[in-house]
Each structure stands twice: as C-alpha cells, then as structure tokens.
C-alpha cells in the first residue's frame, strides 16, 4: 500500500466534463412541462420597454412573470376586518368606530388616550395566587385614526359584554375660502320692468 496505491481498482468515469442536459435521456423533456402556467402571455417580439413597462407598473392588471396573477387585497380587507393596527375607513357621514375585547379587565384597569394620530388602549391586571405568586396581564393596542377624525373628539364606552367601544364623529370636509355649496347671490328675474 505504499506509494499511494489503493488495494482496489478505482476509476472515475464521471470525472470527464459532461453536459447533464445533453447526455441525459430525459434532457429533451426536461423543459417541456409548463407547470400549469402559460409559457408567455404576450408577444416577446416587441421591443423591451413596450412589453416590460406594463409588468413593472403597479396599475397594470395583467399577469406577471410567466402567468402569475397579481395578488388582491388580503382576506381581512375583503371581509371588512381591518389589518392589525389599522382602523377601518369611515363611510361619509358615519362616525368612526372600533371595538376592542377587554372582557378580563375592570374599567379602572383600562386607559384610553390619543397621541400622534393614534388611539392607544392599555390595560393592566394583577391577580395574587394562593401559592404566593402574582399573575399579571398587560396589553397595549394602538389604532391609527383616519384623517377624517379629530383626535379631540374621541370617546370610549364599555359594554356589559366587555367590549370597549371607541367612537369619534367625522370632521366635515372643509372647502377653500370663497367656494361653498350654496350660492350667496340672489336669483335674478328674467323679466325686465321699465319704470317710468
């Protein structure tokens, strides 16, 4: 075994350089499967900017990258439940309203305040255990106020079921100086009267 000899013959037939796509019997069918997607939805003979710009713009409703359809709004937005930390947009004329489940807290353990365009609801609850330990529950929830709501008008009430209802009326839309929905001028009669 001296001089680097091995007790068994060892040959490496795959040591030669080979192309795995050309040598394999499956290589001709490797790229045939479209995986359930259209190969290319548009004509690729167009110059680059003409076919790429629609795919790169956010407003383009077509397919993206080999037939992938752009995602719609999340399921929470489709079913009227706002995303976490966001308040639902108010409808014109209706007050803004959010409910927070605080059934395990007493009213004196809750605090509601507005700060920097957010409503912050926090609660702290402590229980003494018989074994000498203390169990405490703390939570803080921040909800962004819509632009149509004045933070000074926010008020909260606690329902018997343990729901904290936070409401605020919408600020009426303001019109620029000089523009209004009513006309200050008196109506003019089309009849001409000559005084003699």
From Swiss-Prot:
Residues 178-196 have a biased composition (Polar residues). Residues 1-28, 176-196 are annotated as: Disordered. GO terms for biological process: cellular response to unfolded protein; positive regulation of aggrephagy. The modification Phosphothreonine is found at residue 63. It is found in: Cytoplasm; Nucleus. The modification Asymmetric dimethylarginine is found at residues 71, 78. Residues 78-185 form the sHSP domain. GO terms for molecular function: protein homodimerization activity. It comes from the Eukaryota. Highly expressed in skeletal muscle, heart, uterus, liver, lung and ovary. Low levels found in stomach and brain. Not detected in small intestine, large intestine, kidney, spleen and testis. In the ovary, expression is concentrated in the endometrium and in the connective tissue between the circular and longitudinal muscles of the myometrium. Induction: By progesterone. Monomer. Forms a ternary complex with BAG3 and HSPA1A. Component of the chaperone-assisted selective autophagy (CASA) complex consisting of BAG3, HSPA8/HSC70, HSPB8 and STUB1/CHIP. Interacts with HSPB1. Interacts with DNAJB6. Interacts with BAG3. This is Heat shock protein beta-8.
């Amino acid at each position: 075994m001296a001089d680097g000899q091995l007790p068994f013959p060892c040959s490496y037939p795959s040591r030669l350089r080979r192309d795995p796509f050309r040598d394999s019997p499956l290589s001709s069918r490797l790229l045939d499967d479209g995986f359930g997607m259209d190969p290319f939805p548009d004509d690729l003979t167009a110059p680059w900017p003409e076919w790429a710009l629609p795919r790169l713009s956010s407003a383009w409703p077509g397919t993206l990258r080999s037939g992938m359809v752009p995602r719609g709004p999340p399921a929470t937005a489709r079913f009227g439940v706002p995303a976490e930390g966001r308040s639902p947009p108010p409808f014109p004329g209706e007050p803004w309203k959010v409910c927070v489940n605080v059934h395990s807290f007493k009213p004196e353990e809750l605090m509601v305040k507005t700060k920097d365009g957010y409503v912050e609801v926090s609660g702290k609850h402590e229980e003494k255990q018989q074994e000498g330990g203390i169990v405490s529950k703390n939570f803080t929830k921040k909800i962004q106020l819509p632009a149509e709501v004045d933070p000074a008008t926010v008020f909260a009430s606690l329902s018997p079921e343990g729901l904290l209802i936070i409401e605020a009326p919408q600020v009426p839309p303001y019109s620029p100086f000089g523009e209004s929905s009513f006309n200050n001028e008196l109506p003019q009669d089309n009849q001409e009267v000559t005084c003699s």
